[in-house]
Regions:
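Residues lining hydrophobic/aromatic ligand-binding pockets adjacent to catalytic sites
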Residues: 1-152
Length: 152
């Protein structure tokens, strides 16, 4: 049996991930309406942390540190492995989703780093270039408006 993968990505490409054999899961406080994905809200940063970071009262370093503290109080490894064992043989793995297009601007890259260091779990950003030919009709992000609304 092939090992199942854990990838990260953003909501706008949920259909791409699903169409290519990955089961999507939201790791955000709010999942966009109509998004066909499961949820792991325990991996989302707190509202206070998110708001502080977005409006500049918390630095990037503090955000990372506080998010790591939050993750260390959760059973992150168990939460992720529970999702992996529910996959069908045809499914390649799971994709952990949030809003930011750029993974460096987002908690999903912090979560991936945390899992790599704490549990030796290899979690990488989903490579959309690999599936470019399959999805060439999808030039516009499905949830572009939501991303704009959150950035205000």
């Amino acid at each position: 049996m092939a090992l199942k993968e854990i990838k990260t990505g953003y909501f706008a490409k949920t259909k791409v991930y699903s169409d290519n054999g990955y089961k999507p899961y939201s790791i955000s406080r709010i999942t966009p309406k109509g998004c066909k994905c499961g949820e792991i809200k325990d991996l989302a940063p707190s509202w206070e942390l998110l708001k502080g970071y977005k409006n500049g009262t918390i630095t990037s370093g503090d955000y990372t540190s506080k998010y790591w503290q939050m993750l260390s109080s959760k059973d992150v490894e168990i939460l992720l492995k529970e999702k992996l064992i529910t996959l069908t043989p045809e499914e390649k793995g799971i994709v952990l989703l949030c809003y930011e297009k750029n993974p460096e601007d987002c908690h999903r890259s912090i979560l991936a780093s945390y899992c790599n260091q704490k549990f030796n779990m290899k979690i990488e950003e989903y490579d959309l270039q690999k599936d470019k030919d399959i999805n060439k009709d999808e030039d516009k992000d499905e949830y572009e408006q939501i991303e704009l609304d959150l950035s205000k």
